């Protein structure tokens, strides 16, 4: 008898609600129609039950997600042109009309050239499973292109090897995408059609397909195909998996589990039982004589397989993937005192992924526990981001939500992840990354080179908006859905319209999403925003954004291999475009030489390379200043870990408002230490023109040298292995080996992704640099060879060299449309008020003349305690300031962490007794909580108005571990001799004392007695 006795994912009352919704609401009716249409397409295309049953292949047909290993060879005909035009997965197929055939879209030729379908049928054994020993080798003949030779393009399942030694897995690729991946799509379509429509024919087909999968699933094992098979799967090079690599398997298995729950009540269906009984008579297959026998087969062959497969890493993905699969398996089987308890215990058990060389080709792999709570507490940061790139973090969030959703309402457990503070943070974690209502910063392995896309989960946001009291969730849900009439709850919700009411009430009260400047100090990302949301994401949108990334940059420091060594990377958005895009996702998401040495390396990003080597790993940098005044938005971040030889590696970036539609960015990048500094910057696709430089073209080679060639698509060169800094991926080199102290480079931006209707013909980015440099070069760097990407981008490389080098790269960067508003930029003199010597790198000031006659001074000082005379006319004491003159008179000023800013003659326009508050931490929230506090004691007397003025500022607590102590102050109250600072939903918890024994308590980000500062920012207009 089967164990399962009821539906648990889709209980009867939920199915009844769904069918009522289908009758009542147009959106639900459309969903049913779409599911039915898709299911009917599969039923017709595969010719009914028999075609679906035969779609399931067994272990002896390998699986590979690319045709050649890591897509190295591309196409047998057009080579890597295939990769550039169609990506890694661009082979075309028509399973209904031409099964087992792939079409190369670059030449329209088909592969394999033999009739593999006939060969496959000839090799079926008594169980209906393929055995190559039984197959007719006479069918392994090139039938399509005999002029190329009898064996050319022939694949027996193990691939075809060309004359150059490249192996092409046509059959394995087809089996991966058009058998097993297709099975997932079919089961989902049949499941949804049956649940929403009720027609038994969809359940009959689903039962037949699911039962056949259960026949073969226990024997499927990717690791049986050793490394020599040159198969490539989503397995992180572990070789583990079932129908496909272990990462994607953790998603694939869920469609099978949910299908079993959906079809469970009707598995006694006479048509399905009769069909499977007939198959059992033809083949040596047992257990098809009744609905309960079929249920038992599915439970034993699929559901109970999940726990051991997770334990041995055959099902293991990014965090949340396999945990969600295992939680679903436990809930579906519904055995609270047995398998369900074991499965959920593993999901929440502290544990890790363990590998060991045991002499076998792939080694031993084990997942000792799902580690859900330790991971949420220790790895997911206080901003709700996991340790991957943002797009992968979004996947993690969806998987964590699926765990929560599977357990929500299930009476076999008390676990409720929706109550966990980190889960609430995760569900809204995508929102602060949204830019111009159409972009997100492309950090790490994310997206393409400059493409639009929000990657918002509509269902997640709509549900979260109804679940939590956070207006931004509702605003983001409206943005994701676009058409407000389409906002609703899940189709299985008995009251799906309440979600629309929540969203509409929020929009009526708050308006559309219009994010202010923000600093995600836990994740490591600051976004400086100016302009307002017009409500229309088109070319009239005047919002502009500069961002600086400073989060996890490597799997070696708490991150993952989807991170890049890109600390203090700078990006720009404006005029509806991504104006300084990161390269995005490499052509292959693997550790290929080009990814390692170029796309994920430091020099391909808008940051600084020290000593011609990539950065070292870090968890997160240390923000020192963040401020937003309306006229000036500021971020200052130090990254002491990424270059240990540097005493300072720190970027200070400010966006300065010109008017309602235009801004410019002033950027100070201080590097103290090392012997060679390379400032790297690129804007979007477009011609780059230099002014003030005398550039000489280098006719051969790369930036690494005229005798160092650029590596091929998959080539790992001697330079890569011995140097590995990515300089050899720059070509089309032009150099000025004696550059002036000031020059500019102007990029004429191309609307690569056709975002704007007018093509953005007059949009540009101009960078003006004021530095004593040893060399300036303009070079080309390739974007990943993926459809839609630009072929290459033009980079500026500014170089300084010398012993114990100290550099503050000083730039003004202006996005513009039409004509720039910045007419000139010049470095101006700085003198100390006390007459002492001034370190010209420690304090810098630039004079920026604007096209309306106004003049701005931007000043940065490493020593805020000293007073300086700027350009013989401005007195300044502080860390950062912007001083604007109009007609020779003061017009506006912003001062951060300082006490004085104003004309040398006359009264200061900004003056205060202290630029910062300081003191020690007395206490803080010591548990995971939705609301958190830091209790402080100030040094000296601080008046109540000063304390109240801290709201909106940031506290920076010194830490001695890998997390920074930066928190936004959302409230401040005096209690006795202490001040309680409200830091909102950002937790003070860093991790468990011992993840194996959570009852021992937590470790914290702040510590009692730690020093802190609260820099103040003042504005005058």
Task: Kindly label every feature range from the protein language model.
Residues 1-3:
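Basic/polar N-terminal segments that are highly enriched at the extreme N-terminus
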Residues 7-15, 221-224:
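An acidic-aromatic substrate-binding cleft motif
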Residues 10, 14-23, 27-48, 52-54, ...:
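Extended polysaccharide-engagement surfaces of secreted carbohydrate-active enzymes
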Residues 62-63, 74-80, 84-118, 128, ...:
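Long, internal stretches of domain cores in catalytic or enzyme-like folds
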Residues 92-174:
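Long, low-complexity, polar/charged, intrinsically disordered or flexibly structured peripheral segments
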Residues 155-182, 216, 601-606, 630:
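N-terminal accessory/precursor segments of enzymes
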Residues 174-428:
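Aromatic-lined, polymer-binding surfaces characteristic
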């Amino acid at each position: 008898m089967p164990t399962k006795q009821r539906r648990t994912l889709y209980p009867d009352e939920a199915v009844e609600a769904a069918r009522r919704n289908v009758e009542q609401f147009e959106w639900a009716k459309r969903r049913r129609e779409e599911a039915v249409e898709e299911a009917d397409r599969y039923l017709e295309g595969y010719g009914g039950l028999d075609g679906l049953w035969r779609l399931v292949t067994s272990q002896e047909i390998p699986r590979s997600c690319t045709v050649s290993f890591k897509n190295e060879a591309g196409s047998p005909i057009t080579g890597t042109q295939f990769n550039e035009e169609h990506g890694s997965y661009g082979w075309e197929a028509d399973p209904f009309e031409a099964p087992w055939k792939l079409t190369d879209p670059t030449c329209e030729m088909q592969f394999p050239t033999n009739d593999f379908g006939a060969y496959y049928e000839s090799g079926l054994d008594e169980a209906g499973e393929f055995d190559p020993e039984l197959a007719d080798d006479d069918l392994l003949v090139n039938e399509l292109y005999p002029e190329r030779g009898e064996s050319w393009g022939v694949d027996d399942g193990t691939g075809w090897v060309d004359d150059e030694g490249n192996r092409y897995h046509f059959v394995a690729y087809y089996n991966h995408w058009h058998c097993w991946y297709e099975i997932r799509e079919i089961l989902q379509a049949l499941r949804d059609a049956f649940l929403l429509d009720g027609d038994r024919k969809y359940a009959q087909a689903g039962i037949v397909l699911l039962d056949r999968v259960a026949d073969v699933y226990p024997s499927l094992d990717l690791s049986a195909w050793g490394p020599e098979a040159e198969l490539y799967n989503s397995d992180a090079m572990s070789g583990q998996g079932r129908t496909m690599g272990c990462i994607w398997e953790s998603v694939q298995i869920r469609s099978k589990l949910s299908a079993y729950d959906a079809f469970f009540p009707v598995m006694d269906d006479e048509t399905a039982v009769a069909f499977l009984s007939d198959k059992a008579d033809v083949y040596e297959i047992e257990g098809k004589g009744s609905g309960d026998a079929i249920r038992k087969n599915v439970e034993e062959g699929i559901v109970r397989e999940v726990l051991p497969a997770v334990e041995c890493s055959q099902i293991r993905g990014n965090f949340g993937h396999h945990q969600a699969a295992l939680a679903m398996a436990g809930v579906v089987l519904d055995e609270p005192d047995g398998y369900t308890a074991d499965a959920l215990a593993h999901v929440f058990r502290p544990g890790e992924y363990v590998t060991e060389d045991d002499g076998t080709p792939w080694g031993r792999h084990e997942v000792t526990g799902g580690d859900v709570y330790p991971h949420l507490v220790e790895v997911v940061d206080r901003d709700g981001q996991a340790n991957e790139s943002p797009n992968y973090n979004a996947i993690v969030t969806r998987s964590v939500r699926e765990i929560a959703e599977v357990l929500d309402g299930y009476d076999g457990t008390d676990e409720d992840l929706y109550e966990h503070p980190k889960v609430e943070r995760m569900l809204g974690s995508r929102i602060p990354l949204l830019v111009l209502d159409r972009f997100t910063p492309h950090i790490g392995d994310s997206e393409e080179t400059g493409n639009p896309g929000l990657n918002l989960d509509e269902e997640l946001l709509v549900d979260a908006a109804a679940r939590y009291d956070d207006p931004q969730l509702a605003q983001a849900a409206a943005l994701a859905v676009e058409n407000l009439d389409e906002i609703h709850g899940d189709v299985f919700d008995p009251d799906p319209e309440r979600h629309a009411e929540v969203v509409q009430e929020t929009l009526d009260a708050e308006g559309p999403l219009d994010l202010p400047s923000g600093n995600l100090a836990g994740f490591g990302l600051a976004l400086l925003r100016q302009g307002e949301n017009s409500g229309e994401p088109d070319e009239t949108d005047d919002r502009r954004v500069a961002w600086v990334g400073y989060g996890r940059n490597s799997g070696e420091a708490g991150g993952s291999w989807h991170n890049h060594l890109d600390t203090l990377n700078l990006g720009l958005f404006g005029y509806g475009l991504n104006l300084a895009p990161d390269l995005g996702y490499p052509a292959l998401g693997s550790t290929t030489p080009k990814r390692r040495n170029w796309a994920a390396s430091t020099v391909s990003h808008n940051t600084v390379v020290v000593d011609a080597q990539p950065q070292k790993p870090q968890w997160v940098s240390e923000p020192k200043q963040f401020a937003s005044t309306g006229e000036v938005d500021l971020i200052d971040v130090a990254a002491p870990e990424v270059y240990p030889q540097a005493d300072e590696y720190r970027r200070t970036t400010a966006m300065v408002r010109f008017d309602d539609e235009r801004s410019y960015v002033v950027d100070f990048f201080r590097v103290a230490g090392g012997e060679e500094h390379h400032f790297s910057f690129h804007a979007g696709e477009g011609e780059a023109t230099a002014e003030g430089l005398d550039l000489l073209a280098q006719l051969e080679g790369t930036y690494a040298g005229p005798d160092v060639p650029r590596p091929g698509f998959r080539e790992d060169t001697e330079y890569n292995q011995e140097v590995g800094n990515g300089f050899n991926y720059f070509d089309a080199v032009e150099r000025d080996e004696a550059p002036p102290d000031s020059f500019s480079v102007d990029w004429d931006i191309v609307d690569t992704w056709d975002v704007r209707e007018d093509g953005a013909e007059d949009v540009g980015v101009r960078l003006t640099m004021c530095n004593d440099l040893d060399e300036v070069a303009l070079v080309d760097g390739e974007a990943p060879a993926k459809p839609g990407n630009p072929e290459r981008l033009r980079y500026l490389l500014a170089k300084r060299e010398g012993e114990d080098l100290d550099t503050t790269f000083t730039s003004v960067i202006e996005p513009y449309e039409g004509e720039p508003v910045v007419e000139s930029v010049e470095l101006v003199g700085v003198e100390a008020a006390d007459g002492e010597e001034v370190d010209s790198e420690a304090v810098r000031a630039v004079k920026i003349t604007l096209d309306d006659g106004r003049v701005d001074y931007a000043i940065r000082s490493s020593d805020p305690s000293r007073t300086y005379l700027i350009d013989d006319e401005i007195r300044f004491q502080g860390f950062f300031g912007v001083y604007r003159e109009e007609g020779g008179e003061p017009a506006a000023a912003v001062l951060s962490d300082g006490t004085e800013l104003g004309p040398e003659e006359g009264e200061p326009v900004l003056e205060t007794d202290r630029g910062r508050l300081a003191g020690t931490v007395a206490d803080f929230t010591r548990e995971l909580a939705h609301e958190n506090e830091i209790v402080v004691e100030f040094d000296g007397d601080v008046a109540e108005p000063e304390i109240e003025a801290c709201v909106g500022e940031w506290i920076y607590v010194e830490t001695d571990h890998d997390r920074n102590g930066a928190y936004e102050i959302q409230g401040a109250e005096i209690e006795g001799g202490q001040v309680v600072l409200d830091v909102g939903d950002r937790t003070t918890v860093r991790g468990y004392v011992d993840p194996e024994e959570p009852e021992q308590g937590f470790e914290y980000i702040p510590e009692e007695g730690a020093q802190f500062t609260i820099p103040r920012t003042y504005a005058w207009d």
